[in-house]
């Protein structure tokens, strides 16, 4: 009985900040943690078409089919739900926003947005371009509207944007930044004041050039089901906006481990080819009524899920 009580007492005074699930390298260094770092991630994480990668621009090939995207519903203003999912800040998207074109095999509906960051200006992005990392990286995750086992390799289309620190406040990011203090603890939720996805993107003239490759989710189970679009031109946000992420968000309930370095290490490119856009045309960001048919397709697919 005394031994049992001693073990219970030990368990009480030394709680784990994580369950036995996956986590980032910085979390494994916490003596209270028992989670699995990137080297031990399960699922497909050891396969050979993983993400993120370093993009060597001199080795990319132009694909003339990589034209600018048509962004349907990206201009809709909504109050977006957000949460601290214990790994990042995640914004749930909906309402029929989707992307068309860019040599994608179908229409893809926007389902969520999340970010990766550090507290330094050059080590917070997951992808790197010619060996250069950025302060942050934003992923807008889209799901294929019609999907089957036969085409599972293109189940998701992710738009990845590098983010660097500048000297001007990015008004498009400000609604999200203002909401961060309300989701400090893991699993906490809140709502971003009315804004649009378009507000967070670079000007259309900065979205002509992007890179394309087939890869994986960058978190377990690391399924190799992603068509990656990585934009060359970074988004700029003010230093104070950037620092709000690591300042306000925490990995643990006790709020002792600030959320930062939520970045998977680079993965080997292997035999894959990275392509780049020719993109001579204009990016089309259209209001919902302008493209009625694709928009209704997005909405109906969302309703039927």
Swiss-Prot record:
Signal peptide: 1-17
Active site: 87 (proton donor/acceptor)
Residues annotated as domain Alpha-carbonic anhydrase: 20-278
Glycosylation sites per record: 123, 214
Positions of substrate binding: 218-219
Cofactor(s) for this UniProt protein: Zn(2+)
Pfam families: Carb_anhydrase (PF00194)
Keywords on record: Cell membrane, Disulfide bond, Glycoprotein, GPI-anchor, Lipoprotein, Lyase, Membrane, Metal-binding, Signal, Zinc
Amino acids binding Zn(2+): 114, 116, 139
Membrane topology, from the record: Lipid-anchor; GPI-anchor
Propeptide: 278-305
GO biological process, alphabetically ordered: bicarbonate transport; carbon dioxide transport; regulation of pH
Record localization: Cell membrane
EC number of the protein: 4.2.1.1
GO cellular component, one term: extracellular exosome
Disulphide-bonded residues: 23-35, 45-222
Main location: membrane
Annotated lipid attachment (GPI-anchor amidated serine): 277
Broad enzyme group: lyase
A GO molecular function held by the record: carbonate dehydratase activity
PANTHER family the record matches: CARBONIC ANHYDRASE, CARBONIC ANHYDRASE 4
Quaternary data: Interacts with SLC4A4.
Family listed: Belongs to the alpha-carbonic anhydrase family.
Function (record text): Catalyzes the reversible hydration of carbon dioxide into bicarbonate and protons and thus is essential to maintaining intracellular and extracellular pH. May stimulate the sodium/bicarbonate transporter activity of SLC4A4 that acts in pH homeostasis. It is essential for acid overload removal from the retina and retina epithelium, and acid release in the choriocapillaris in the choroid.
Protein's UniProt name: Carbonic anhydrase 4
Source organism phylogeny: Eukaryota, Metazoa, Chordata, Craniata, Vertebrata
């Amino acid at each position: 009985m005394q031994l049992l009580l001693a073990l219970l007492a030990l368990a009480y005074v030394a709680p784990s900040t994580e369950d036995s699930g996956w986590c980032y390298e910085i979390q494994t260094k916490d003596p209270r943690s028992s989670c699995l770092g990137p080297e031990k991630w399960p699922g497909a994480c050891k396969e050979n078409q993983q993400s993120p990668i370093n993009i060597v621009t001199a080795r990319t090939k132009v694909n003339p089919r990589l034209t600018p995207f048509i962004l349907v519903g990206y201009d809709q203003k909504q109050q977006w739900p957000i949460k601290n999912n214990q790994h990042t800040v995640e914004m749930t998207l909906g309402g029929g926003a989707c992307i068309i074109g860019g040599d994608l095999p179908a229409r893809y509906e926007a389902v969520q947005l999340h970010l990766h960051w550090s507290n330094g200006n050059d080590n917070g992005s997951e992808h790197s371009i010619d060996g250069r990392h950025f302060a942050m990286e934003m992923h807008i995750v889209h799901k294929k509207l019609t999907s089957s086992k036969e085409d599972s390799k293109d189940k998701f289309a992710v738009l990845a944007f590098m983010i660097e620190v500048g000297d001007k406040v990015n008004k498009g990011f400000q609604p999200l930044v203002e909401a961060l203090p309300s989701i400090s603890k893991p699993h906490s939720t809140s709502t971003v004041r009315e804004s649009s996805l378009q507000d967070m993107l670079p000007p259309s003239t900065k979205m002509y050039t992007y890179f394309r490759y087939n890869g994986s989710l960058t978190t377990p189970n690391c399924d190799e089901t992603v068509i990656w679009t990585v934009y060359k031109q970074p988004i700029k946000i003010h230093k104070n906006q950037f620092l709000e992420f690591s300042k306000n968000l925490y990995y643990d309930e006790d709020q002792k481990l600030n959320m930062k370095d939520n970045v998977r290490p680079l993965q080997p490119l292997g035999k894959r080819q990275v392509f780049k856009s020719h993109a001579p045309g204009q990016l089309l960001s259209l209001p919902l009524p302008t493209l009625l048919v694709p928009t209704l397709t997005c909405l109906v697919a969302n309703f039927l899920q």
